[in-house]
């Protein structure tokens, strides 16, 4: 079945930023679109979708644990069967980590959700993207090579590596954290930073391979940095949240990527409030005598 109604999907959407993005997109599309609000807990997903539906928004609850490859593929197949394709996908699901829990006890869930979950979503939903469609991964401004020591940059050589290579890189990183070797290898102290770099790398790798077709079809594939958002996941890590945005405020720029005109220069890049955050700093000019 092919639908002429716009179809959107947001993961990790039963709360926080994801819920605000789903609501904002449904509000922007109105009767012209339907948004799948997904998460891994059926009760929370159903409650969130029901609340938005009571507000007059066209949302559909969907249970999808991005840590489960079969669940992701199954949801993609159901949407393909019902609608023939998708117009907007936000891979937003993220694992909440705590300062009070050893990194070795958290890193597997973090990587499986944030990174392997993102590449599962990209592989499953990228091929379903319709002409003019957009696929974004929610990341952060930590997700650039500037956050990583130079000797580790080659681990994220997005110009040449595949998504499979990247999956192995982040698995190797998780292994290093669990074994206690990560610090000695020079990885950042906060495990969220390599995870965010991996998310942006996934976008860059997939976008590289799809560039010609995506440009022809007017599609956008990018990572988005919403900035500091006051959510359950962020509060334990920041003592001053006075400048944090509410989820609804932060969702505005994400929804713009779904509904506004496509800026070709944003393709494959990390975008924050309409501005591209460079993956790597330009090489310094070589001076000659």
Predicted regions and their residues:
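A glycine-rich helix->loop->beta "capping" turn
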Residues: 57-58, 78-91, 97-103
